[in-house]
Amino acid sequence: MALVHGHGTLTLAVIATAVWWLAVTIGIIGGAALLRTPDGSPVDRYGIPNGLTALRGYACVPVLLLGTLSLPGRLGLALWGCIGGSVGLLDAVDGIIARRYGPVTVLGKAMDPFGDALYFVVGAIGSWALGIVPLWLAILIVARYAGPVVLTPIVLLTGRRPELVYTVWGRRNTLFTGVVLFALYVVRLFGGPVEVVALIIALPTLVPTALLHFVALFQRVAASPRAG
């Protein structure tokens, strides 16, 4: 990176990564109060599932830099698939471990959707920068994942206390998003028509599931109790 962009860019990248890692660490430590099971029993450790979710959080800025800073030849595309894709797969692994081996915690239920939101936003931006997805699809993915994160504080300020967990359609949309991004990565890798393939596979899968996810979120908010 230093050879391509200069030492100044490398220094800024290191600083940005360090600041981000500090912010993630503070968030994880601050969330220790939520280390309890959904039925209220205290948990004395973060556990592997929460650790894997945290790892995705730590990886966001390095992966974003990997996608947006040009590298020689097809190196950026190759690293994006190897590193970005591998970290993204942790989303499936942490849930499986939590359900099978535990611990399932309130912290994990809150962190996992938030971690997904961060990582898929990074994935959308990096994929667009690398020519893996068209702009409209990147915007759709960013809106789908950033929207609930941005709206959650507003909902809480109204006094509503909805459960901060996935919706069924949100899980389905996340699965489809991962499949679409992988398919388009392969198309881009072999020089195929990314725009055409995106229209064929993303429109009928991501658009309706994203809309149904937001409908489910609004219904959850409307049915949620008020604080106090």
Task: Spell out what each predicted region is.
Residues M1-T53, G57, P113-G228:
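A feature for the membrane-embedded catalytic helix bundles of lipid/isoprenoid biosynthetic enzymes
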Residues S41-I83:
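Hydrophobic alpha-helical segments and helix pairs
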Residues L65-T68, G85, L89, W128-A129, ...:
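Hydrophobic membrane-targeting signal helices
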Residues G73-L79, L107, I132-W136, P193-V194:
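Membrane-helix interface segments
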Residues C82-L90, A143-A146:
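Hydrophobic transmembrane alpha-helices
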Residues D91, D112:
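Conserved G/P- and acidic residue-centered "switch" motifs that form tight phosphate/ATP-binding loops
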Residues G95-P103:
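Membrane-interface helix/loop boundary segments of multi-pass membrane proteins
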Residues P103-K109:
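Amphipathic cytosolic juxtamembrane alpha-helices at the membrane-cytosol interface
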